[in-house]
Amino acid sequence: MRFTGEEWALSPTAFSTYVKCPLKFYFDVVERLRSDDELDESVDNMTFGNIFHEAADLLYKQTNGYADPSARLTELREKGEVEKCVDKAIAKTYFGYKDGVLRQELGGELIIIRNIVREYLGQNLLNYDIKNDDFTEVATERKIGMIVPIRVGEESFDIHLAGRSDRIDTLKNGQLRVIDYKTGKPRLNYAGIESLFHGEPIATTRESNIINTLLYSMIISHNEGKDVCPELYYVGSMVRKDYSPRFVETIDRQSRTLDSYADVAPEFEDEVKETLREMFNRSIPFRQCEDDSACKYCDYQTICNRK
């Protein structure tokens, strides 16, 4: 059975795809279909994101265990480690050189990508963490997972939910912090946990990045037995003086900043289990999403036959 063993886990990304559109989940995750257009159009964004994540991992591994790491981050930047890590990331993720050594001069779009990654990492991200340095970095790119037991009718399933967290910190107040790096436009607001799973229009309510980060928080909270603070680092926007990486929940015009996963854990985990029960219910087909707001840029329109 898929997603019930160590070799084939259900990732947070796959889970949030199902929340938005079960049929897209079927095409994308179960059948593993990929259109040529999807691959062509996404290569630049994927390349940029992969290079940034690899460079951040290489750089922040050098801060592991440093409390209040502003001095360490400043030292690394002054020693040129940002540039070195970006070049190593390009060598590893783009050219496939496992030793991280560039063997040729860069040209065209790769030069542009390198310059932007250097700016996002060496200025936006480092400046933010230097200013807000009340943390100790625990791990980068850590594989995490947990078993979620569910029952569907007479059948029982142990769902293996697993992924790779970009960064885990310990905060001075004793919390763990899970950070997900993003290179797109900030989307940190949501209208309550229920809206993340059932809200419409789908494209603007079922925020995949928030769902994914809450799933990482759920896994870490269960595994470590500690409270977790979920945060999204939209690195392109961290240069703003008023930038905050924390989620803002707004219900009935009342807003609150989500400082603790525990504040939403019961409701969120109920929704996760209910979604998994639906996913594994043999009598429920992989259907099209309820409205077409999420269909505009979907690469499966030609085979979906939505009317």
Model feature map: region roles:
Residues 205-210, 215-307:
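Metal-dependent nuclease catalytic regions and adjoining charged, substrate-binding loops involved
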